[in-house]
Every structure is written in structure tokens, then in C-alpha cells.
A protein has these predicted regions:
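Phosphate/ribose-recognition catalytic cores of enzymes acting on nucleotide-derived substrates
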Residues: 219, 224-279
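Nucleotidyltransferase catalytic core that binds NTPs
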Residues: 2-234, 243, 247
């Protein structure tokens, strides 16, 4: 596996691969990789001639009061995992290399205003900007994103269509710990009590998945799921919403495919989880 930090160097490698008609799979990450990332890499490895993993804690998707400086990092462990999974290239750009006094950003209306966008108003502008840059730099055939960040996945699919990127966006299932907690790099922030309390998210998800087919009104489904979170003393709700899978607008009736998504704080750590119900 090769590790590259310079944009010019990776663009030259991409040019060589493209000239040989090799397909490229891109797995964008912020590092501190876990088995959830591993599942994306494995799928990319199975479907492409070349696999690139980007490892970049993107400053433009963090607000001033968020955890940019404390976000967990372990490049050595990340390299070992990627090498073991057959990654061809890890791209590790610097903030200065990716953002040289930028005046241009990529934003998406409406979709970025809902759910996480309400409490993180500039987050998805940063996500869309860095993903656009990664697409332009690596020119992937396919790009792989996890369903845990469902709003991000929906936004990136829409952005890719709107900007006419000739890239297939692949969404991959949530990978969970043995006790159900969705794998996340931010789980490392949790102390033992918070870690135990955080399982209320997956318990709420499991309840929702089990009863949604009964045809309950969205309000009743939402209330029953919220109660599980609210009964946990260490949990502080940001949101729990049932929204249309395409527009991310709240729904009252479960007549179309929906995303059931939540964000909950445990101490200083904010975790998200979701499930999709398709009709």
C-alpha cells in the first residue's frame, strides 16, 4: 500500500490507472478506522481494480465549538488496517493542501437544513465541499459511504446527480457492536457509564423497526421510540425525527419510504443512529 499526501502525486497515479482503464473505488474517511470503515473497504475491494481510502479530518465540517482538535486520530493503526484489507493507496492530505485560502464552497439547499443541519448549520457545506474535492482529485468509479450517516449519504447522492459526476454512490449497512451500538469513531469519547447508556439508541431503533410495519401513525411511533431515550438519565436528545427518504421533510403518515433518524448527547459526545423503512 502506498501513502500519499500531495494532491499532484495522487492525481498522477490516478491518471496512470485511468489510462489503463482501471476502475477506482474511493472510501472517504476521517480516520480512526473501525470495523464499519472496514466493511466499506471490503466492498470497494470486491468491486474495483484500485481502492483509495482518504484519511482527512476535514476542518470545514466542524463548527467553532465542536471537536476538530480533539477528534481521535491514529494514522499508524489506520495504515495497518487498510494494508490488511488490500487498499492500494491511502490519501492523507493536509488542511493547507486541501484549503489554500478558499473562496469556493459547495452547498446544497433544503436537504442540509434538516435533522443534523439544524444544530450544525455549516456541517454539510463542509462535507459537500470536501467530497467534491476528493471526487475531482481521485476520479473514482464508485464511492462508498455508510448508512449510519444517512443524511450525509442522501445529500451526497443528490449532489452527485446535480453536479453530473459520473460516479456511482454506494451506501453500505450500519455495522454495530455486539450490544447494538452503531460503530463510530466518536464512541471512543464515552466513559464506561456513557458507553452503557448509549445502547438506548439501538434499543430505540430495534423497537421502531419491530413496530413500524403495524401501521402506527408517525407521531405514535416517534413517541414510543423517544421514551426509550428519555428514560435514560445520561441521554440528552438533540432530535428524533421520521422524515421522507427523499426530501427529509417530516411525515405524519407512513405511506412512503422514510428515514427514522436520531441524534443524542451523552456527556460531551453526540451520537447518531437511524433505520430506513422502504415501501
Amino acid at each position: 500500500m502506498k501513502t500519499v499526501s500531495e494532491i499532484a502525486e495522487i492525481k498522477e497515479l490516478v491518471y496512470q490507472w485511468k489510462s489503463k482503464d482501471r476502475s477506482i473505488g474511493l472510501v472517504p474517511t476521517m480516520g480512526f478506522l473501525h470495523a464499519g470503515h472496514g466493511s466499506l473497504i471490503e466492498k470497494a475491494r470486491a468491486e474495483n481494480d484500485v481502492v483509495i481510502v482518504s484519511n482527512f479530518v476535514n476542518p470545514t465540517q466542524f463548527s467553532a465549538n465542536e471537536d476538530l482538535n480533539s477528534y481521535p486520530r491514529n494514522l499508524e493503526a489506520d495504515c495497518k488496517l487498510c494494508e490488511s484489507l488490500g487498499v492500494d493507496l491511502m490519501f492523507t492530505p493536509t488542511p493547507e493542501g486541501m484549503y489554500d485560502n478558499p473562496l469556493t464552497f459547495v452547498d446544497i439547499n433544503l436537504l442540509s437544513d434538516e435533522l443534523c443541519g439544524k444544530s450544525r448549520p455549516t456541517h454539510f457545506r463542509g462535507v459537500c465541499t470536501v467530497v467534491t474535492k476528493l471526487f475531482n482529485i481521485t476520479k473514482p468509479t464508485k464511492a462508498y459511504f455508510g448508512q449510519k450517516d444517512a443524511q450525509q449519504l442522501i445529500i451526497i447522492k443528490k449532489m452527485t446527480r446535480d453536479l453530473n459526476f459520473d460516479i456511482e454512490i454506494i451506501g453500505c449497512p450500519i455495522v454495530r457492536e455486539k450490544d447494538g451500538l452503531a460503530m463510530s469513531s466518536r464512541n471512543a469519547y464515552l466513559n464506561p457509564e456513557e458507553r452503557k447508556a448509549a445502547t438506548c439508541l439501538s434499543k430505540s431503533i430495534a423497537l421502531g423497526e419491530s413496530i413500524i410495519k403495524k401501521g402506527l401513525p408517525a407521531r405514535e411511533l416517534k413517541d414510543r421510540m423517544k421514551k426509550i431515550i428519555e428514560d435514560e438519565p445520561l441521554a440528552r436528545m438533540d432530535y428524533l425525527e421520521i422524515v421522507d427518504l427523499n426530501t427529509l421533510q417530516p411525515v405524519k403518515c407512513l405511506n412512503d419510504s422514510v428515514l427514522v433518524a436520531m441524534a443524542v448527547h451523552f456527556g460531551k459526545t453526540r451520537l447518531i443512529d437511524n433505520f430506513i423503512y422502504e415501501i
